[in-house]
Regions:
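N-terminal signal peptide c-region/cleavage motif recognized by signal peptidases
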Residues: 14-16
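Conserved beta3 VAIK motif of the Hanks protein kinase fold
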Residues: 97
Length: 173
């Protein structure tokens, strides 16, 4: 019980600091904001740790980096996020973009090489800070319907603690 109280106290104290780090973030899509899923929903087989942006039942909308950082990981899987991009930001937070229909051409080439090298469709590739830097607004892929998705949308998460702690950034206003 003491551990739970300590964790809650830490989160309460740090919330204003975490909120400040996303004051200047932009929307990842050039569409009116409309959510089909929110943080904290209990799904039949998991806790929903992000938000789902509607894309009007269509795929292929440009997905933008919400802040400066670097692409630290991409993943491809027939389940979960499907095609996913992970951006590490310079303040220690991470944004995750899931169910993409495609990556940028440079990332797509790396993914294809890795798939052939591993003789596997599913891959997870980590990158160093200097390989794929991104600026706020850069296109990192296209919205889609890959992985465990019930329809076209963009799944996005914000994680703290070096990418290990999903957080409800919508609660910050």
């Amino acid at each position: 019980m003491k551990r739970i109280f300590s964790l809650l106290a830490l989160l309460t104290i740090s919330a204003p600091i975490l909120a400040q780090s996303y004051d200047n973030a932009i929307c990842p899509l050039d569409l009116p904001i409309s959510l089909s899923g929110t943080y904290g929903e209990l799904r039949h087989n998991h806790f929903h740790a992000g938000v789902d942006f509607r894309t009007g039942g269509q795929i292929g909308f440009a997905v933008h980096a919400i802040k400066d950082g670097y692409i630290s990981k991409v993943s491809v899987s027939p389940t979960g996020y499907g095609n996913g991009v992970y951006i590490t930001h310079y303040d220690g937070t991470m944004s995750v973009y899931g169910h993409l229909s495609s990556f940028t051409p440079e990332i797509a080439q790396r993914v294809l090489r890795e798939q052939y090298s591993n003789e596997s469709f599913s891959v997870s590739i980590n990158f160093s800070e200097d390989e794929f830097p991104v600026k706020q607004g850069d296109v990192i892929g296209k919205s889609g319907n890959t992985g465990s998705s019930a329809g076209p949308h963009l799944h996005m998460e914000i994680r703290e603690e070096d990418g290990n702690l999903p957080t409800n950034y919508l609660a910050w206003g």
